[in-house]
Structures are given as structure tokens and as C-alpha cells.
Amino acid sequence: MGKALPYVELPLPSSELALVRPACYFFLMTDTEALSLKGRLLVAMPTIGDERFERTVIYMCAHSHEKGAMGLVLNKPVDGVDFRELLDQLKITEVAIDKLPVQYGGPVEKTRGFILHTTDYKSDGASAVSEEISLTATLDILRDIAAGCGPDRHFLALGYAGWAPGQLEDEIKANGWLVADGDAGIVFDSAIDAKWDHALASMGISASNLSSSGGRA
């Protein structure tokens, strides 16, 4: 297995460092006891109650009632973190691609790197999340991306969102997030500022259809 991505020493903007998860997220989903959210999208409702989390889309990488849940925020850019500087810090010298957006993945381990990518890329460190998407957190994939021989599509994030066992199930019952299919097009191709709208559209709804009480209109 490849060496895990080390923690990034580049300072994050103070606004990002202050980004903490509110006391309670809100979700809307039926049959919560039977359905795993792994490989799906959590889409923030207008009633989220915290402007720092408005229009948030989270790709769920793991979820079980015994171990809790883990996901990556898809639409919160990290300003002030340059990909080329990151490569220099990690002593990656074979560089054909030196420009790649660095996204904010969540409030846990905010300087640790995680890469979502298409399953055409195979490595010992890759963990399949769905038929189309894998998660890798090793230096090997970052080297390959920089060298131009990485996966067809990829998404680099710092940090992740995590839930203790039972926490996510409790939050789902509060009715304030929607759950959408984990469309690879939304994960990799949609513009950052369009992911929320595209995730809603994948369910056949728009922001104007959402009721102020947290469910569908």
C-alpha cells in the first residue's frame, strides 16, 4: 500500500479554519434504518440554519450503523492553497499538471488530503465507494495525477465530514437535507457553484420547490 498523504502545512484561511459543523444537520430520507448512504449525495436544504453550510453537497464515502459515517463536501473551495506549492511541499518533482483545484472536504482533519476518482485508476490504496467512484488517500495517486497518468477524473479535498455511530441516523430524522444518487457527473464535472442546483435537478426539483419547513413543497 502506498504511503498515506501527509498533513498539509500550508495555512488555511481563517474563514475555513472557523468552519465547524453546527450542532445538528438536517436530512430527509425514508427507511433510514435499512438504507446505507454510501455512494450517495447529501444535499443541504434552505433550512440548514447556518450560512456557512448553505447549498452544501456532500458525497458519502462510508456509512454504517455500527461505525458511523464519512463524506466529502464537494462545493466549498479552499482559497489560498496552491496545488503546485502542495506538490513542492510533498517533494513531488515529476510535474506535467500543476494546476488542480483544492477543495474543502469537511471540518475533520482539515489539512489531510483525500482524492475521489474514477475507477479506471487502480492501486492498492484505492477503496471503491461505488461502481464509478473510488477514494484514495495515498501519495501515489497524487504523484500520478501530477505526472499526467492519474485517473480520468478526480477531485482533491482537504478534510472530511464525519459522524459517530447513530449520529447521522438521528440527524436524518430532523428533516432538513435531501438524499440524491451519487452521480459521477455532479461529483467530477459540475462547476463548484452549480453542484447544489444540479444535485437538486437530479431529483427533479429546484430551490423554489423546497418548503421552508425542510421537506418538499
Explain the meaning of each model-derived region.
Residues 5, 26-28:
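Short hydrophobic targeting helices and cationic amphipathic motifs
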Residues 29-217:
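A short aromatic-anchored loop/beta-hairpin motif
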Residues 5, 12-13:
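Short, often N-terminal, low-complexity regions
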